[in-house]
Design a protein with these regions (language model features):
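Conserved, mostly hydrophobic/aromatic
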Residues: 49, 92, 102, 128, ...
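Aromatic-rich carbohydrate-binding modules that target alpha-glucans
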Residues: 533-581, 589-607
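Substrate-binding/active-site clefts of carbohydrate-active enzymes
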Residues: 33-45, 50-240, 255-281, 302-303
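Active-site-proximal helices and loops of the catalytic beta/alpha 8
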Residues: 163, 231-332, 347-349, 357-361, ...
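Tight coil/turn sites that cap or link beta-strands
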Residues: 507-511, 604, 612
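C-terminal beta-strand-rich structural cap/linker in extracellular carbohydrate-active enzymes
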Residues: 45, 493-526
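Short, solvent-exposed loop/turn elements at domain surfaces
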Residues: 54-63, 341-342, 540-542, 553-555
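Sec-dependent N-terminal signal peptides of Gram-positive bacterial secreted proteins and lipoproteins
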Residues: 7-29
């Protein structure tokens, strides 16, 4: 019996040693694996990056020159990679964001079927399980995540479970070539729908089952496809330590699968539901942690870029009760599928500041598109009217200065949002609304912490008396300070329907973010503003435009001016340096030139002109 026991002990020891060896070998594959520093949540501020367009940290992985790698041709690979992102992490951290959303990481098809663009963006998936070699190796991706985590920056993966690249001919049920198909096991035609492209976006069957722009639509009703999608992305999330995911084309994915998918991955997800209907979008929060707030995006952009009424924003926010948690909505003013904000806003930096202030103080999680802080303008000519913009709005990052006014403005907004938790999880309550002025409160009803935002979107100063909400803890006589310029202060006074109110005169195109704290002194950095004032009564119904040399002015199309009185039109430019000279000429309705020679302007000055037409 003793001998038998000894043999048994020896056998068990050998099994344990073998098992430990196997586990050691398996874990050595991911010896550099990163781990999550915490799940994405409403406390975060997101910075969205197209990896290929950020920074080229390794020229050896750029691909074949003249094929997919074509510097300057924005439908093709430009060279950005994970090494480049890693090198610029301090720049991103210093901006004040807390999470980085990177473009899809899986290996993409080199070129589209017709060769008109490369898979630089990450949405032409070829091999879900392998990293795209243009971005780097898996170990380089893991190193990027680890370095981000060291800086307390979360990483959000962009995932693409809806489709692969366009391998199947329209409505075909088999591949036409063994050489042109996705990597196994996704090269099984039974895993796909075969209906052709979506033609009618009001037809929900088409939205869910047809192809998105020719990209092969995966059938998540197929159990094997469903299981493999969950497994491959679970591996990515686990191996690199991702903290959340953004689900591409979530509108076209079965909702039950979205819920199952998020559960399998084990991290919060937010989906792209590309439509402005709150009733439609809100349903997705029953299946995912969050969702991109396209309804608010469309209306906020109209308000801040095109000067429409604040009632359009109010009408969206009034429907917040339809969402499971409106603080989990991801808010934005532009992205890789829309024109850049400055492109639509006639390059008006102050409009940009107001739009950014809005998404940083309204409910939801703000998302800043890369390059916004560097005043990227997306070519300056709107293109989304012709479809999904995918060139100039995805330009290569122009630089990494931390001294620009917009960079510093976003930095300040990040500081404010990070300090005041009510801006992250507080209840949103409207205080005042009219066409050109909007005011709202964000209040933590447990602690009483409150921030009041007032935005004047008019071209004139506005004087208003605004009632304090009944829910507020603010008392008569309490001092409020503007966190965007602490020299601006006011007091809560008696009166109004709630017995407490604030009275203020707020300058044109200005936002106040008010706290009852006593914050450290802060004023916005000095701005170099070039102001052109055209003195002319253009008549009822007519508008004044400017054409000229030196962006944002061009000779091909005009910039619309603001009418500040019967015969005075104004246009402000912040892109010119002090002393920089340029030419310009006013036009009525952008089709009738003023008489005489071009006017000469100088950066940093106010130029008054009195044209004849």
């Amino acid at each position: 019996m003793k001998i038998k026991c000894g043999k048994m002990v020896a056998f068990m020891l050998s099994v344990i040693i073998l098992f430990v060896g196997v586990i050691t070998n398996l874990s050595s594959i991911y010896v550099n694996a990163a781990t999550s520093i915490g799940a994405l949540d409403e406390n975060d501020i997101i910075y969205m990056v197209l990896t290929d367009r950020f920074y080229d940290g390794d020229a050896t992985n750029n691909g074949t020159l003249g094929v997919e790698y074509r510097p300057g041709e924005l439908k093709y690979t430009q060279g950005g990679d994970w090494k480049g992102l890693t090198k610029k992490l301090d720049y991103i951290k210093n901006l004040g964001v807390t999470a980085i959303w990177i473009s899809p990481i899986s290996k993409n098809e080199t070129l589209s079927r017709d060769g008109s663009e490369s898979g630089y963006h990450g949405y032409f998936t070829h091999d879900y399980a392998s990293p795209d070699p243009h971005f780097g190796t898996k170990s380089e991706l893991i190193n990027f995540v680890r370095e981000a985590h060291k800086r307390n920056l979360k990483v959000i993966l962009d995932v693409v479970p809806n489709h692969t690249a366009d391998y199947l001919e329209t409505a075909a049920t088999n591949y036409s070539s063994n050489a042109y198909q996705p990597a196994a096991p996704f090269n099984n035609p039974d895993w796909y729908h075969h209906y052709g492209d979506i033609k009618d976006w009001n037809n929900e069957f088409q939205v869910l089952n047809y192809d998105l722009g020719g990209l092969d639509d995966l059938n998540t009703d197929n159990a094997d496809a469903r299981a493999e999608l969950k497994a491959v992305y679970k591996n990515w999330v686990t191996d690199i330590g991702a903290d959340g995911v953004r689900v591409d084309a979530a509108r076209s994915i079965d909702k039950d699968f979205l819920k199952e998918f998020e559960t399998a991955l084990g991290v919060p997800s937010f989906g792209e539901v590309f439509i402005g209907d709150v009733d439609y979008v809100s349903k997705f929060q029953n299946y995912e942690w969050g969702v991109l707030d396209f309804p608010l995006f469309f209306q906020a952009r109209e308000v801040f870029a095109h000067d429409s009424s604040f009632h359009n924003v109010k009408n969206i926010l009034d429907q917040d009760f339809k969402y499971k948690n409106p603080n989990h909505l991801v808010t934005f003013i532009d992205n890789h599928d829309r024109d850049r904000f400055l492109c639509l806003a006639d390059d008006n930096y102050q409009k940009l500041r107001l739009a950014l202030t809005f998404i940083f103080t309204v409910r939801g999680i703000p998302d800043v598109y890369y390059g916004t802080e560097q005043e990227c303008f997306g070519g300056g000519v709107p293109t989304e009217w012709a479809g999904i913009p995918n060139k100039e709005n995805r330009e290569m990052m122009p630089g990494f200065s931390e001294n620009g006014n917009i960079y510093k403005y976003i930095q300040r907004l990040n500081q404010i949002r990070s300090k005041y938790s009510c801006l992250r999880n507080g209840t949103q309550r409207e205080m005042w609304v009219e066409d050109k002025l909007y005011s709202y409160s964000r209040r933590n009803d447990l602690t009483g912490q409150e921030i009041i935002t007032v935005i004047n979107n008019d071209t004139q100063p506005l004087t208003r008396t605004i009632p304090i909400r009944t829910e507020s803890s603010l008392s008569i006589g309490q001092k409020l300070t503007n966190l965007l310029n602490t020299k601006d202060t006011l007091n809560v006074i008696s009166g109004g329907i709630t017995g407490r109110q604030i009275s203020l005169t707020i300058p044109a195109k200005t936002a106040y973010v008010l706290t009852s704290d006593t914050p450290a002194a802060y004023s916005e950095p000095n701005r170099v503003v070039t102001t052109i004032r055209v003195h002319y009564d253009s008549g009822l119904g007519n508008n004044m435009y400017l054409r000229g040399s030196g962006y944002p002015l061009t000779w091909s199309s005009g910039r619309k001016m603001f009418n500040i009185s019967n015969d005075v039109w104004i246009y402000e430019i912040e892109r010119y340096d002090v002393g920089e000279q340029f030419e310009f000429k006013p036009m009525i309705n952008d089709n009738t030139w003023s008489q005489g020679n071009n006017y000469i302007g100088t950066g940093g000055q106010t130029i008054d002109v009195y044209p004849n037409f």
